[in-house]
Amino acid sequence: MRINKNWVIVALICAGLVVLVGRSSSTMKSAEAKEAESGLAAGFSTYEQAFTKAKADNKLILLDFYTDWCGWCKRMDRDVYSDASVQAELGKYFTAAKVNAEATVSHTYLGEQRTEQQIARHLGITGYPTLIFMTPDGQVVEKIPGYVQASEFTMVLRFIGTGAYKTQEYQSWKKTQS
């Protein structure tokens, strides 16, 4: 009878640990989602808001894939997205969202629930920052890996935003913009 009592105590302790770990995990996931939302740069929406706004306003989408440890991503936030000309072009043509390529926050992507990590993997993103331009229905228009200076980024935003990308190469178009 003594052995059975010990097994009951062990089972209760294990059950308690399972419940504790489960609660901790769900708390971490909701904290991660809140952090993702509160850490948005000025002018950026959440992933879902970006697609909703893009459809409603008939604008393109800019997804900025980043990681928390990426120095160039932080520099992009600090030096590029704060630039007035970048903000003007973004507001005119795009809805933008930041996507943490290592996060486990889930979104609907191509009709399926996927984490930000899975979305980044599906889009072939291996370096950060990487900028993905999309139509409101999720079709990729352009993929730009790496840091882009504000003056160049303003031109890229105008090139894609005006639809010039449909008929011209960027370098040829850029020469006509002086």
Q: Where do the language-model regions lie?
A:
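N-terminal targeting signals for export/organelle localization
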Residues: 1-40, 178
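Structural alpha/beta surface segment adjacent to cysteine/selenocysteine redox centers
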Residues: 89, 93, 99-126
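Active-site-proximal beta-strand/loop segments in catalytic clefts of secreted hydrolases
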Residues: 65-66, 99-102, 134-136, 146-147
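A short beta-strand-turn-helix
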Residues: 43-60, 90
